[in-house]
């Protein structure tokens, strides 16, 4: 069976529907989920892992992957980097066949 990891990168207060999202993750037990954020999250399903870091730490991580200046001033601009998530999060997705 293939190993799959879904990345979720979100900074700030989590949306009100977040517990429902976690519940759906639980029922997709053949997929792992990685959440990178700055919140305290408890009671995670076994297939959900959290990497807690500040937005500034994430900016430093992103910049460390590129040899040119990166502009990431606000969390909502993280979506601009989705095509590079595999590179940015490479240390977290080692051993997976697919990531998204």
Question: What does each model-found stretch correspond to?
Answer:
Residues 1-20:
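N-proximal low-complexity "stem/linker" segments adjacent to membrane-targeting elements
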Residues 7-12, 35-38, 81:
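Short His-Asn-centered micro-motif
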Residues 19-22, 87-88:
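A generic local structural motif
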Residues 22-32:
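Short, acidic, metal-binding catalytic loop of nucleotide-sugar glycosyltransferases
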Residues 27, 92-93:
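Alpha-helix termination/capping residues and helix-transition junctions
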Residues 38-92:
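Active-site-proximal specificity loops/subdomain of glycosyltransferases
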Residues 95-100:
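Short beta-strand-to-loop acidic/aromatic patch adjacent to the donor-nucleotide binding site
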